[in-house]
Amino acid sequence: MVGYNFAKVRSSSKGGEEIRLSPLELFYKLTHPEIEHPRPSQLVVLEKWYAAYQSSINDNIVSLNTGAGKTLVGLLMAETLRREKGGKVLYVCPNNLLGKQTLDESKRYGLDVASYLNLDGNGAAWSKEDKYLANESVCITNYDAVLNSLSKFESHEIVGVIFDDAHIALELLDKQYTFSIENAELIKQIAMLFKDSPSIGYKIESLLQNDPQSLTMVPLSEWHDAHEEVKRLIIKSKAHKESGAFAWKFLQENLLHCLCFMGAGKIEISPLYPKSKSHYVFSKKIQRVYLSATVPNLGDITRVFGVTPKRIESESPDYRADRLFLFSKKIGLSNPDEFIRKSLSELKEKVFGIVPNKLSLLTYKTLGITVAEDSVAALEKILEFKSDKIQKLVLSNRYDGIDLPGAVCHILVIDGLPWQGDLKTRFFSEYFHNENNAFLRAIIAAKLVQAFGRTVRSADDYSIILLLDKRLNNWLLNRDNDKFFKKDIV
């Protein structure tokens, strides 16, 4: 890995005051003789972003392909903001694992950063907190630490935030304003309020029987009549004190303007538009950069974040990654998916798989393949997989936030169309039909692009991608969906 020595980029004046440099000027302070120029895509986005920043455009979404040096670009932007604005800057990662990877990369670049991460499983802890508080270092942290209702960063004078894998922030912020109920008795009490509903009354019985297919949204007119009683039941049960305290703090006075979704063993209440402007990260006039290998739907960003960012992209990729896509339906067997799954369990090579939900994990578990059913177990198993302690690993709904470069893994399995676990997205997905709705098709494509990048992390990397499940095969082979992908994929 190339070394950068940002520590030497200081003026010769007394006190060692830092020189204000553009991100490209910082880039050229290389200590490794083999690296003389940024990649074309890095050059383009850094120039475009710096011009937007100097024009006082506060929100910018920057898209770079997997393996194009997105992390370095983000760190250069963060360092530029810290130096020019003289304040605190956060570089926010999806999870602790990617936070650790970013921390390691920043050190190799010669960038002296602080961090607030949970690296040992014993809770989040500071590294170089004093340098961060003195505005001398960017802080690397994760989304949970920044977006939760008790964030320690809220009282800080933040001048800039870099959101890595920004689409994850969309989901997490939406979740912050969603009140979830899993108490069986409370679910029954609320559901029974609508047992005589002409619109959804017939669904209540299957819902209370925990039918996995049961899913509905309370009609707005009926929610208008029942929301006060729902509020009374929630307060009486004290469910608002058990979990979702932040969401309830906002929702309790705004229930009338919320949507209520009911599914097997769960009820979710959320506004159509999260009150993101009340969140300290989005309420202040600061620099926000949204990094992503895919360009999230700008309408969704506006809905969730309450901002309309400037789109910054490179016109063409630096390379076309070597990916071999194999479609199970093209094999010509009567049951190709079952054949491939069984063959994978017998394969000597390492294999990483992604399925849409926990139920789908059971198929692989019965074949003796390692699976992880929750986020804590997933992080543990990913580390074991990277260190070759296990050869096969399948996770549910983990289309992003995992880097498996080079020899770590060259075989990726995607088994099933991406599926989002929250009731709201599930409801709209089913109501509008995935295959026909442009908005939902864009979401599916974005998740698949993220998945394709798990095992291809650089220009000299390669991957075999096995695509299982009839619906997934048909969706990808439908040429009408090509427009939702970048040219380097289709």
Task: Give the ranges of each region predicted by the language model.
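Inter-Walker segment of RecA-like/P-loop motor cores
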Residues: 97-101, 106-157, 379-384
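Pre-Walker A (Motif I) flank of P-loop NTPase domains
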Residues: 54-62, 87-88, 137, 286-287, ...
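Conserved pre-motif I regulatory segment
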Residues: 8-63
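Conserved coupling segment at the C-terminus of the helicase ATP-binding
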Residues: 27, 31, 43-44, 50, ...
